[in-house]
Amino acid sequence: MTKKSYLRKEYIELRNGITFDEVDNAEINLLSIVRNNSELYANKKVSCYWSIGKELPTHELVLMLSGIGSEVYLPKMIDNSKKLKFVKTDGQLSLRENNLGISEPIGNTEIDPNELDIIFLPCVCFDKKGYRIGMGKGYYDYSLAGIDSSSIELIILAHEFQKIENCLPEDHDIKAHM
């Protein structure tokens, strides 16, 4: 097992071990930060993931962003590839579970990732340099390779305990702004 695989396994177990109260408190803190800084997100093109399990919850965040005038896009896996497309959500949040149990938007209105203003990224763990370890398939790294990251705010959403010293980045890993 590689060091990265070990970190992934360890931090998934840690995340699965937190209480639902801790998850709820983390969500309250996230929503408070966004609410208190809503001018940074209003009227922007924002991609957010639809959280699962004990990831930092994003369901209310997606609704909040829509409510302040952001165009919200959710990732959708492209069949037989390691890439994502970013699909606009409608006001009803019409979603369908894919074969991995991840909720994805049903719509077809896509956006080129370079046209997004903000991309919220999930992670298993992250480091102070802005690198993250995901679930191990590289969907975000492959999908965002080649974007102009100087004009797109890449923000990792995570619980505080998920911060580590070094994620052992590889050449293909994208760097977030935190």
Where are each of the predicted segments found?
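Aromatic side chains
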Residues: 49, 73, 86, 126, ...
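Short, well-ordered strand-loop elements centered on a beta-strand within folded domains, enriched
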Residues: 81-87, 131-133, 154
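Surface-exposed, charge/polar-rich loops and edge strands
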Residues: 2-6, 13-20, 114-119, 128-131, ...
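Short glycine-rich, flexible loops that bind phosphorylated cofactors or substrates
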Residues: 55, 127-128
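N-terminal active-site beta-alpha-beta segment that forms phosphate/nucleotide-binding
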Residues: 1-115
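Redox-cofactor binding/interface segments in oxidoreductases and associated redox assembly factors
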Residues: 48, 121-122
